[in-house]
A protein has these predicted regions:
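Surface-exposed extracellular loop regions of Gram-negative outer-membrane beta-barrel proteins
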Residues: 1-4, 13-45, 50-67, 155-158, ...
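Outer-membrane beta-barrel proteins
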Residues: 7-11, 23, 45-49, 71-73, ...
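Extracellular/periplasm-exposed beta-strand and loop segments of Gram-negative cell-envelope proteins
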Residues: 7-10, 143-151, 186-192, 199-208, ...
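Extracytoplasmic gating/loop element in the C-terminal half of outer-membrane beta-barrel translocons
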Residues: 42, 295-297, 349-358
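Solvent-exposed loop/turn elements at secondary-structure boundaries
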Residues: 70-153, 172, 176-208, 251-252
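Conserved small-residue
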Residues: 97-114, 119, 222-323
């Protein structure tokens, strides 16, 4: 397929090209197999880097349809049982790059091409002065440095699941384990020194891992021709970890993001409260902290991580949870009587951080 689209207020069209395929096989309602592939091309990458192949494979075994299972005593209780697994790769070609003019990250295109920026004469910090007096003129300057080696970001996803039904499917449950490894993540290069005067295009340098489990349980029953009810619940646990983010070597070892979940906050560790002024005198100075002009008994006392006698940003360490919950759960029920029905569902989250500002 070929795809051509236009963005809002954008003259250059977006273009992509690709081919997809699928093969499905089933034998005797017991053995299932599926193979998919996508061969995709993106305008964001240079020739020789534009296309990526992303296959996936899935297998399933309906154990409850096996003759030996039907003859077993367990089939009288667990009437259905299935195990399944899948392994696949997907790609991402959307690139977010730092824009020094806007001082923010924006979606970037054609990062394999050198970028040049128009200099606005109304901006006194960036315009040029020629001749005598304050005669500012427009011009062109070098912008983001091209990266011709950039290519697809890939994600390898593994899933193993179990499905079961008990008491003629009056009680069913599904449990899944998943593992995802994102590699060659399109990440902004952080190792270019500031005296270069510009920024480098994103590169395939990031690696992040994500894994967890999901559980779903359902119970439903009919009581007579007019009344039925159902109860259901679910729970999931997921945790990600940064493997590599291209962090500069100058970053303190205990402040590097590698080994922690994405966006783990850096905070100071408290040791309690200052008891008196003697306690303040014996402790590392906290006057370097923002807003701290004086320290009094009853104020929080922080730990000097690097032992230099001063509490500042270099004493912050990765601590606590991120604002993305690791645990999500829910439960609910429904009741039906003739044409009347009533249902409710509760949801909750756990193991996440909230920053409270006094």
């Amino acid at each position: 397929f070929n795809r051509l689209s236009h963005g809002y207020n954008v003259d250059l069209p977006y273009a992509s090209q690709g081919m997809v395929g699928r093969f499905v096989y089933g034998y005797d309602t017991r053995y299932l197999a599926e193979v998919n592939f996508g061969y995709n091309g993106s305008e964001n990458f240079a020739k020789g880097k534009r296309y990526g192949l992303f296959p996936s494979f899935a297998l399933g075994w309906v154990i409850s349809n096996e003759p030996f299972y039907k003859k077993s005593n367990i089939s009288k209780i667990m009437n259905s049982l299935k195990i399944r697994g899948s392994l696949g790769w997907v790609g991402n070609d959307r690139v977010w790059a730092y824009d020094p003019v806007a001082n923010t990250s924006t979606e970037a295109r054609f990062i394999y091409l050198q970028q040049y920026e128009y200099v606005d004469t109304s901006n006194t910090d960036n315009s040029y002065i020629f001749g005598i007096g304050d005669n500012r003129v427009q011009g062109i300057r070098q912008g983001r440095v091209a990266n011709k080696d950039v290519s697809w970001e890939t994600s390898r996803k593994l899933n193993i699941g179990l499905e079961a039904g008990l008491f003629n499917n009056a009680l069913t449950f599904n449990i899944d384990y998943f593992h995802e490894r994102r590699s060659d993540i399109l990440t902004q290069v952080q190792t270019m020194p500031s005296y270069v005067g510009t920024v480098f295009s994103p590169a395939n340098i990031g690696i992040v891992q994500n894994q967890g489990v999901e559980l779903e349980v359902n119970h439903s029953r009919f009581i007579g021709p007019d009344f039925s009810y159902s109860i259901k619940g679910n729970m999931s646990f997921a945790r990600n970890k940064v493997i590599d983010m291209g962090t500069p070597l100058g970053v303190l070892p205990y402040q590097r993001p590698e080994g922690y979940p994405i966006d783990t906050p850096l905070k100071l560790i408290t040791l309690g409260y200052f008891q008196d002024y003697d306690d303040i005198e014996r402790s590392p100075s906290q006057l370097a902290l923002e807003g701290n002009t004086e320290v009094h008994p009853g104020d929080l006392k922080y730990k000097d991580i690097n032992g230099d006698g001063v509490i500042n940003s270099q004493d912050q360490i990765a601590i606590g949870y991120t604002n993305l919950p690791e645990i999500m759960y829910g439960f609910g029920a429904s009741v039906n009587y003739k044409r009347w029905d009533f249902s409710f569902f509760f949801q909750g989250t756990g193991r996440y951080g909230i920053e409270m500002i006094d």
